[in-house]
Amino acid sequence: LYGYAQMRATVAKTMVNSKWPGYREDMHGTYQDKQIPNTYSCYGDPAMETLLQYGLKGMRDITGLNLKPTYSYWRLYKTGDVLKRHKDRPSCEVSTTLCLGYNNTNLKGRKNNWEKYDWPMWVDKTGGFNNRGVPINMKPGDMIVYRGCEIEHWREPFLGANHAQVFLHYNNVDGPYGENCVYDGRPHLGLPPAFKS
């Protein structure tokens, strides 16, 4: 090597794909989330996709399943936001929800104890619809692992100022969705939904 080298066609195809300009528009998130309109969310954020990959070994260990990552999605809930009861799509076969942090100081001086306020995620562990459900409280750094396509889950109206939550989704390679949903139809992690095949 004489101080420099030239390499040709070494960039991943996704970097020169015609969809690439859309990446810049999508990478900063949106307020167009259909589940919770006017609330900030971001699909495939590079930092969260790194967390998704980083958590893979632990997820395999805790579930005993041959998992592959599908996608990450994070949301910044605000006062009054509600997550309706639902089950997830096939790319969310094995899901996690991780509490990144929250601000409840807007509750100071109210009847409820704002310092102890947790916003639970409710799960219906029977897998059926419209049963009472079980609340699971989370502090920053806590994570819930659940079967997103089987377990109905929801959140009641949020009372605090804001609450950041990331969802990390995986599929069981040996399960009903197999390899079909790996990377949620994208060529690899770290890309926005415009790259889905």
Predicted region positions:
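C-terminal helix/juxtamembrane-tail motif
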Residues: 185-197
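Catalytic core of non-heme Fe(II) oxygenases with the double-stranded beta-helix
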Residues: 79-150, 154, 162-166, 172-187
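Short helix-capping and hinge/turn segments at secondary-structure transitions, especially at repeat
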Residues: 60, 64-65, 101-105
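Conserved active-site beta-strand element of glycosyltransferases/polysaccharide synthases
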Residues: 76
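Non-heme Fe(II)/2-oxoglutarate
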Residues: 1-63
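A short coil-to-beta-strand element that immediately follows conserved catalytic motifs
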Residues: 64-73
